[in-house]
Design a protein with these regions (language model features):
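Amphipathic alpha-helical recognition patches that constitute DNA-binding helices
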Residues: 51, 73-76, 80, 139, ...
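Bulky hydrophobic/aromatic packing residues
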Residues: 46, 101-106, 118, 128-129, ...
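Non-transmembrane alpha-helical segments in soluble domains
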Residues: 54-57, 130, 149, 202, ...
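Helix N-cap and loop-to-helix transition residues
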Residues: 77, 122-125, 139, 197, ...
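Gly/Ser/Thr-rich phosphate-binding loops and adjoining beta-strand/alpha-helix segments
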Residues: 24-39, 108-172
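Non-catalytic, low-complexity flexible loops and terminal extensions
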Residues: 1-23, 54-128, 317-343
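Acyl-thioester-dependent acyl-group transfer interface
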Residues: 1-36, 40-50, 66, 154-343
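Short, exposed beta-strand "edge-strand" segments with a Pro/Gly-rich flavor and a Y/T-containing core
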Residues: 72-74, 114-120, 136, 193-196, ...
Length: 343
């Protein structure tokens, strides 16, 4: 039986909003035959990524009876939090960026980040990516995180830096918040080193899950319900609201409607998704597979850059790294257009 609980995540996003952060989760739909996304933003106080995707599809007439459930067998445990406490107490060492093109701008709670780029693979390309990951015995998450990190490294002052990512973990099936679209999301951190392979990244993610780091972070958020609002704001402002500093968040909403049973016109096309960006987490990378087409979306916090060419270059590099990996395994490389961006 899933444990009953209340949402411990929403109050943190309310505190972030009070600090001027935009807390909308970015979703997008590119209608068939169109090249311009219809952007939709849902507050992270109300839904998480999976919940938001389900909510949007349901509102457009799709039947989504049951949301994805956690697959990893580790059980919730307070001991995992005790074991992780030293990690919370370590000093934070954010990476330094090389100068990026374009201006920076203060974040406001009312304006979405203007610097965003995206790409949607067609069905054969998406199938190739799944096939290569299956052959290598790795997840699509591990594959994409490794190549995203390599794509961004040239923009860091020290290209050999260890790059930490926050990777959300869906805890539905072991936690019940009453409403299935609510914030059923914890996270693990994965630190990607320049010399590591996709298999190394895959192993590191699963070792973190095996240690129960997602349950440690979930328990930490549960205990944080007793913190005063001003303390939450202070911790966010100091970058201490997570177990360590992260370059950004990488979130995969998984595979939706692979049998293409959803036929409502309002749901058709390619779907996009990116998690929010915060001052303590400057990049938001998201992917989702809808009706066998994988999409990539990358947005940048405005205090890093408001120039959409910045994430567009990173997405272009990301696709290139994916293509190189596919070409090393498959006889025919993936052909791809330039990534889309929003000015």
């Amino acid at each position: 039986m899933p444990s009953s609980s209340s949402d411990p995540i929403g109050p943190w996003f309310i505190a972030a909003e009070a600090l001027g952060e935009y807390i909308g989760i970015r979703f997008g739909r590119v209608a068939p035959g169109d090249n311009t996304p219809e952007w939709i933003f849902l507050r992270h106080t109300d839904v998480d990524g999976i919940g938001g995707m389900a909510d949007l599809l349901r509102r457009r007439g799709a039947e989504i009876p049951r949301l994805p459930q956690i697959k990893h067998p580790s059980a919730p445990s307070a001991f995992s939090l005790l074991r992780s406490m030293p990690k919370y107490l370590r000093p934070r060492h954010p990476a330094r960026w090389r100068p990026l093109e374009g201006e920076r701008r203060n974040s406001t709670h009312s304006d979405p980040p203007p610097a965003v780029a995206w790409h949607i693979f067609d069905e054969p390309e998406s199938t190739q990516i799944r096939r290569v990951c299956r052959k290598a015995g790795v997840t699509i998450n591990s594959f994409l995180v490794k190549h995203l990190t390599k794509a961004i490294r040239p923009s860091l002052e020290d290209e050999s830096s260890v790059v930490p990512w926050m990777i959300p973990v869906n805890v539905r099936g072991k936690v019940d918040l009453g409403r299935d679209t609510a914030n059923h999301t914890s996270y693990v951190g994965v630190r990607v080193r320049s010399y590591e392979t996709v298999r190394d990244v895959h192993r590191n993610i699963y070792e973190a899950l095996g240690r129960g780091e997602h349950w440690a972070n979930w328990q930490a958020y549960q205990f944080s319900r007793f913190l005063p609002f001003r303390v939450k704001k202070s911790m966010l402002a100091q970058g201490k609201a997570t177990s360590e500093w992260y370059l950004g968040g990488f979130s995969n909403l998984g595979d939706w409607d692979p049998e293409s049973r959803i036929t409502r016109p309002e749901c058709q096309g390619g779907w996009l998704f990116a998690p929010p960006v915060l001052r303590c987490q400057l990049l938001g990378a998201g992917c989702v597979t809808f009706q066998n087409r994988l999409s990539l979306t990358l947005q940048v916090h405005p205090e890093l850059s408001v120039n959409p060419e910045v994430p567009a270059a990173w997405v272009q590099n990301w696709i290139k790294e994916i293509e190189i990996d596919l070409a090393s395994v498959l006889s025919e490389p993936v052909a791809h257009p330039h990534p889309r961006l929003v000015a």
